């Protein structure tokens, strides 16, 4: 006589559980200057007439720095970019670097 086959259904199969691997994300470091404080700027300070502050937000070529360099949150970065664009239209900031 033939012996009955063993129960080979998948319902009896137990899968080995893997341990979850958690990625370690490094903290943001201040790339511009290490002594600079990371305090948020109020909306009133970010203004198109505040050229000294706006010059810190653009490169030597006149491009706007991204958030990872300015260390501003999303709302402050939007205010900063709008203020830079307004200052360019008024003529307080250059659009591009002057060529020699």
From Swiss-Prot:
Q: Record's superkingdom? A: Eukaryota
Protein name (Swiss-Prot/TrEMBL): Small ribosomal subunit protein bS18c
What Pfam families does this protein's entry cite? Ribosomal_S18
GO BP field: translation
What family, per the record? Belongs to the bacterial ribosomal protein bS18 family.
Question: Major location, coarse class?
Answer: plastid
Q: Which residues cross the membrane?
A: none
Under the heading InterPro entries, the entry gives: Ribosomal_bS18 (IPR001648), Ribosomal_bS18_sf (IPR036870)
Among SUPFAM superfamilies, the record links this protein to: Ribosomal protein S18
Keywords, A to Z, come to: Chloroplast, Plastid, Ribonucleoprotein, Ribosomal protein, RNA-binding, rRNA-binding
User: Cross-referenced PANTHER family, in alphabetical order?
Assistant: 30S RIBOSOMAL PROTEIN S18, SMALL RIBOSOMAL SUBUNIT PROTEIN BS18M
Drop me one GO molecular function for this one. structural constituent of ribosome
Name of the coding gene = rps18
Q: Which GO terms describe its cellular component?
A: chloroplast; cytosolic small ribosomal subunit
């Amino acid at each position: 006589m033939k012996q009955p086959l063993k129960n080979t259904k998948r319902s009896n199969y137990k899968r080995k559980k893997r341990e979850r691997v958690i990625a370690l994300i490094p903290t943001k470091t201040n790339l511009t200057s290490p002594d600079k404080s990371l305090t948020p700027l109020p909306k009133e300070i970010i203004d198109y007439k505040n050229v000294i502050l706006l010059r810190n937000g653009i490169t030597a070529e006149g491009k706007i720095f991204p958030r990872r360099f300015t260390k501003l949150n999303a709302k402050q970065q939007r205010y900063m970019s709008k203020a830079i664009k307004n200052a360019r239209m008024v003529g307080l900031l250059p659009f591009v670097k002057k060529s020699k």
